[in-house]
Regions:
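Active-site loop architecture of trypsin-fold serine endopeptidases
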Residues: 61-62, 120-122, 154, 167-184, ...
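Chymotrypsin/trypsin-fold serine protease catalytic domain
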Residues: 22-27, 89, 106, 128-135, ...
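A conserved glycine-rich beta-strand in the N-terminal activation segment of trypsin-fold
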Residues: 48-52, 56-74, 123-124
């Protein structure tokens, strides 16, 4: 049986020399018939994704990492737990299309971060966190994304199209995140299909997966970024993990399923639909 490493899609660098690392989990790949090729996403236009957030995460004095996130309220950013776990501070970029050219920028400390109490870094379960920021003024380039209604909690979304966005690597050969915001339209697959690749111990009801036909996929540096329904713009997931064999190899990409955490989000932010 072939083994593959599943990784959280976070890109980290040190100031001395850029280095890519990920938090690894070795799992059996049950379906090894997939193939893929590198196909970049599309470049976003200014204001196309006004809820997109960029996060520069200070890990230590000499190292930092990049993740994505989404603005869900005028004081709240939603992202992945594996992005914020152990960070010293976070610089939040709002309203940007070019990665660090933002309409508004805030730096907050670790005390402004709420990580899910049951986050498990060894299995990537409950990979979700919140960042509280100073109140932001909405504009054409800064808007909150809509979250799923509680009534839709049991929807699988299988077969629907969704849009993922972020500044992550645009190819497996890239060594750093991209400057310009990228996006891709992806097809949601059932968890049963996704589990054929990663196994049922990894893919659970709190995940949502997409196919990466043609090698179009999320990649390192996209972690925590939004997955929204193409039909409505409602955010249903946040980028969590993929396969270490490569972003463009055709293996499914996995997200944290937001309908599993609507109560948690409401408890901590007061936001609900």
């Amino acid at each position: 049986m072939k083994f593959l490493v599943v990784f959280a899609l976070l890109l980290a660098t040190t100031y001395a020399s850029p280095v890519l690392y990920q938090r690894d989990l070795v799992v059996p790949v049950l379906d090894d018939s997939l193939e893929g090729r590198i196909t970049n996403g599309e470049t976003a236009s200014a204001g196309q994704f006004p809820y997109q957030v960029g996060l520069s995460l200070k890990l230590s004095t000499f190292s930092s990492a990049w993740c994505g996130g989404s603005l869900i309220g005028n004081q709240w950013v939603l992202t992945a737990a594996h992005c914020t776990d152990g960070v010293k501070s976070v610089t939040v970029y709002l309203g940007a299309t070019v990665r660090t050219s933002a309409e508004a920028t805030y730096t907050v400390s670790s005390s402004d971060i709420i990580i899910h109490a049951d986050w498990d870094s060894s299995t990537l379960k409950n990979d979700i966190s919140l960042i509280k920021i100073p109140s932001v003024t909405y504009s054409s380039k800064i808007q909150a994304v809509e979250l799923p209604a509680v009534a839709s909690s049991y929807s699988t979304y299988a077969g629907e199209s969704a849009i993922a966005s972020g500044w992550g690597k645009i190819s497996d050969s890239a060594t750093s995140v991209t400057s310009n915001l990228q996006y891709a339209t992806l097809s949601i697959i059932t968890n049963t299909v996704c589990a054929r690749t990663y196994g049922t111990s990894i893919v659970t009801s709190s995940n949502i997966c997409v196919s990466t036909t043609g090698g179009v996929s999320t990649c390192n540096g996209d972690s925590g970024g939004p997955l929204v329904l193409a039909s409505s713009g409602v955010q249903i997931g946040l980028t969590s993990f993929g396969a270490s064999a490569g972003c463009a190899k055709g293996y499914p990409a996995a997200f944290t399923r937001l309908t599993s955490y609507l109560d948690w989000i409401q408890t901590n932010t007061g936001i609900s639909y």
